[in-house]
From Swiss-Prot:
Keyword hit for Cytoplasm: yes
Domain TRM112: 2-120
Function: Acts as an activator of both RNA and protein methyltransferases. Together with methyltransferase Mettl5, specifically methylates the 6th position of adenine in 18S rRNA.
GO terms under cellular component: cytoplasm; nucleoplasm; nucleus; perinuclear region of cytoplasm; tRNA (m2G10) methyltransferase complex
Name of the featured protein: Multifunctional methyltransferase subunit TRM112-like protein
């Protein structure tokens, strides 16, 4: 699972959950899969990102020295930061781990890079 995907996942479908975001991420196994840097693509995805979740993912991936805690206003003018953001979001692949609902504690496993977000009948 790419960390860009993590930024969009929520557990709001669980009965009684009001927000369900951001999910608590645990990484047990990850790999770096290099991809071509496209600054325009990174710029266009910025408005869709929740920066606190981006920074939280950076903390779990141990990349906080690369990503600031608060989104800079001039981020599109900072190509180095865009490259670091590209690395975090599109090159870090979570192979094994889990996502946890912040409201219920429900755990969703990540296996072979695929988060299992399926719910049981009694959870919907």
């Amino acid at each position: 699972m790419k960390l860009s995907t993590y930024n969009f996942l929520t557990s709001v479908a669980i009965k009684g959950v009001k927000v369900g975001f951001p999910l608590k991420l645990t990484i047990n196994k990850k790999e770096v899969v290099e991809s071509e840097f496209n600054p325009t693509f990174v710029e266009r995805i910025l408005p869709k990102l929740d920066w606190s979740a981006v920074y939280g993912a950076a903390q779990v991936a141990e990349l906080t020295e690369d990503i600031p805690a608060v989104q800079p206003e001039n981020i599109v003018e900072n190509e180095l930061l865009l490259q670091k953001l590209h690395h975090l979001l599109f090159e870090i692949d979570v192979l094994e781990g889990q996502l946890e609902c912040p409201e219920t504690g429900r755990v969703f496993p990540i296996s072979d890079g695929i988060p299992n977000m399926l719910l049981n009948e009694d959870e919907v």
